[in-house]
């Protein structure tokens, strides 16, 4: 089932295109990662997907009654503000103790209900933000650099939990990430963005694409190529590199 689809999406800021002629889609159960340098339009694309930013031209279609959960990069909370995890999860609509406990357990942090938000570690904070996103029972879970500031083991544990959540509730997951090694292990499909879609496809295919290497350098290819995708996904670069490899084999 297709959850969100953008066609020829263009967004301009003061006349300058931030995104130009972008085609995008995500289906139920998929894990899709968007990669791109700073200023490439990743956050702009996310905002257009959730409906927070209108398109200058093009079309966007969302499944009827689509529920979206969103985990931001970070959340600033005034350190002088007394705010428990339970109260945070109840804003702006109060939820029951059982709902709070279930959401925290689903996110892998049971027992934090009475903790102060300002006393949480980085990893605990991200799990609480995940719990909040899961309260709506989302069809689509969006993670915007959600592991920024976590160490590698913390990031790996967080993404393992995301994979578990996807399996449990059957949602699609859309990630923006700079952690290339995690992308390869976690994604069904990778989209390389730089104001437009440079290339798209299964992770191993994108890693070998010249468009990808022009943005991230060929030195990343060795680490990324450790991943071997088990399924045959389409590859939608300006040039079909998978076809070239077959013809020259």
Swiss-Prot record:
Span of domain ABC transporter: 1-219
Biological process terms in GO annotation: response to zinc ion
Glycoprotein found in the keyword field: no
UniProt-recorded Gene Ontology molecular function terms: ABC-type zinc transporter activity; ATP binding; ATP hydrolysis activity
Enzyme class: translocase
Protein's membrane topology: Peripheral membrane protein
SUPFAM superfamilies, per the entry: P-loop containing nucleoside triphosphate hydrolases
UniProt keyword Transit peptide, yes or no: no
Catalysed reaction equations from the record: Zn(2+)(out) + ATP(in) + H2O(in) = Zn(2+)(in) + ADP(in) + phosphate(in) + H(+)(in)
Enzyme Commission identifier(s): 7.2.2.20
Superkingdom: Bacteria
Classification via InterPro entries: AAA+_ATPase (IPR003593), ABC_transporter-like_ATP-bd (IPR003439), ABC_transporter-like_CS (IPR017871), Metal_Ion_Import_ABC (IPR050153), P-loop_NTPase (IPR027417)
Residues bound to ATP: 36-43
Cellular component terms per the entry's GO annotation: plasma membrane
Keywords: ATP-binding, Cell inner membrane, Cell membrane, Ion transport, Membrane, Nucleotide-binding, Plasmid, Translocase, Transport, Zinc, Zinc transport
Subunit structure, interactors included: The complex is composed of two ATP-binding proteins (ZnuC), two transmembrane proteins (ZnuB) and a solute-binding protein (ZnuA).
Family recorded in the similarity comment: Belongs to the ABC transporter superfamily. Zinc importer (TC 3.A.1.15.5) family.
Function description: Part of the ABC transporter complex ZnuABC involved in zinc import. Responsible for energy coupling to the transport system.
Protein name as catalogued: Zinc import ATP-binding protein ZnuC
Organism annotation: Ruegeria sp. (strain TM1040)
């Amino acid at each position: 089932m297709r959850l969100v689809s953008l066609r020829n999406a263009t967004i301009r800021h003061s006349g300058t295109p931030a995104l130009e002629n972008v085609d995008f889609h995500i289906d139920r159960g998929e894990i899709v990662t968007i990669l791109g340098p700073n200023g490439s339009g990743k956050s702009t694309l996310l905002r257009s997907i959730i409906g927070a930013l209108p398109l200058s031209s093009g079309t966007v279609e969302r499944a009827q009654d689509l529920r979206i959960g969103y985990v931001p990069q970070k959340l600033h909370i005034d350190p002088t503000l007394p705010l428990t995890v339970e109260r945070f999860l109840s804003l702006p609509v109060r939820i029951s103790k059982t709902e709070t406990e279930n959401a925290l357990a689903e996110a892998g942090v049971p027992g934090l209900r009475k903790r102060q938000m300002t006393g949480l570690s980085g990893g605990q904070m991200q799990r609480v933000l995940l719990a909040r996103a899961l309260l709506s029972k989302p069809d689509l879970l969006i993670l915007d650099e959600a592991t920024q500031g976590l160490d590698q083991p913390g990031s790996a544990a967080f993404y393992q939990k995301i994979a578990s959540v996807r399996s449990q509730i059957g949602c699609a997951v859309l990630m923006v990430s700079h952690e290339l090694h995690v992308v390869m292990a976690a994604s069904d499909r990778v989209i390389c963005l730089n104001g437009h879609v440079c290339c798209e496809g299964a992770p191993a295919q994108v890693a070998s694409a010249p468009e990808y290497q022009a943005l991230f350098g060929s030195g990343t290819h060795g680490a990324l190529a450790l991943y071997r995708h088990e399924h045959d996904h389409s590859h939608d670069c300006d040039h079909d590199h998978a076809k070239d490899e077959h013809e020259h084999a």
